[in-house]
Each structure stands twice: as C-alpha cells, then as structure tokens.
From Swiss-Prot:
It comes from Pyrococcus abyssi (strain GE5 / Orsay). Binds 1 Mg(2+) ion per subunit. InterPro entries: HTH_MarR-typ, RibK_CTP-dep, Riboflavin_kinase_archaeal, Riboflavin_kinase_CTP-dep, Riboflavin_kinase_dom_sf, WH-like_DNA-bd_sf, WH_DNA-bd_sf. CDP binds at residues 97-102, 193-196. The lineage of its organism: Archaea, Methanobacteriati, Methanobacteriota, Thermococci, Thermococcales. Gene3D superfamilies: Riboflavin kinase-like, Winged helix-like DNA-binding domain superfamily/Winged helix DNA-binding domain. This is Riboflavin kinase.
Amino acid sequence: MKMKTLFLLIKLAKMGAIGKEITVTMRELSRELDVSPQTVLRWLEELKEQGYIHKRESRKGTLVELTEKGINLLEKLYEEISTALYSGFIVGEVISGIGEGAYYVRQYAPLIREYLGFDPYPGTLNVRVLFPKTIFDALCTARPIIIPGFTRNGRTFGDVRAYRVRIDGIEGAIVIPSRTVHPPKIAEIIAPVKLRDALNLKDGDKVRIEVV
C-alpha cells in the first residue's frame, strides 16, 4: 500500500468509517489531505480495489466504510508503532531540580531500602523526557512497586510509585509521588549513587533510561 493511500485510510477511520458507512465529499477530503479532488477519488478507488474499504454512491453522496481487511491493517499498524515507540526506554535531557529531592529521599529511605533493595543517594536525577511523548507512555506496560505512605511528626507523606530502571548499567528507579509537582515530561530518578557524578552528567546532557 502507498503511504498516501494509507493516510487516507487513517483519515476515514478518524471520521468514523468503522462499523458504519459515512458520507464523504472529494472536496472535503482534498482539503484535509492537500491534494486535488481527482486524486482523492483515485485513492478511494485504489482502496476499494485492494479490499480495504466498501464504497458506493447514493443520493447523499459517496458512502464509504472500512472493511475487515482495512480495520485489521490499522490494528496491525497500531501494534507495530506502539512496539516501536513504547518499548520500555526513555530518552531525556538532564536538568536541575527544585531542590526538594534530597529531603524526600531521606524521609523515604528506609522504605526504599525495604521495597527496592538499595540505600538511595539523598537526591534525585531530574530528566526532561524527549522520547516518548511523556513518562507515562514509556511506563504504560511496566508494573510499579508501590512504596506506601506514612505520617511523621504530624506530616503526611503519600504513596510513591517506583519503576525499576537502568542507566548505563547503574540500577535505580523512577519515582512518582502521589502528590508530585512535576509535569509528565519530568522523570525523577533515585539510585544507590549520585548519578551526576557516577556518569559525569551535567545539565543538557542526553541520557537513555531503560525500564527493567
């Protein structure tokens, strides 16, 4: 299948042509795809001939619906793209934090030792996620380790979700507090060592984080 006709098939699916017929006009599709109406008509005929859509004319206009073959193609494409994009790693850029990491790591240190099996360095490595779109896209298939919250000196500390990761062979964990102030583009990483020193990192350096 040509890439351009694939884009048209995706467009038809987004317009609702799965499980029902929809009315389309060549003029509307030509604007959406930035091609001539004649080109859209030719692509529709190609999709019909290849068995990806049903197409017929009516008084209302051109009616189209994806066939089972067309739906299966998009499902397969989605699976392949998801595997490529969300395969358990993060590419990011080292940034400076807001200075609260050391305090919180010290408070949770006994529980981190119990649930993750290492004594954490009192601080976090902050990484701005460049790929995939958000930290949650990379972690969507990983199972978190829940570090339970607690109360100390009248102050409540909430649950923390931890995901085991590896950076250049060093084991650590991405931690996501239930009361985080960070946007989904920021990953906070704890480890048994100071990662900036161990990996000779500075702000702006690129890192690859493997979810394990």
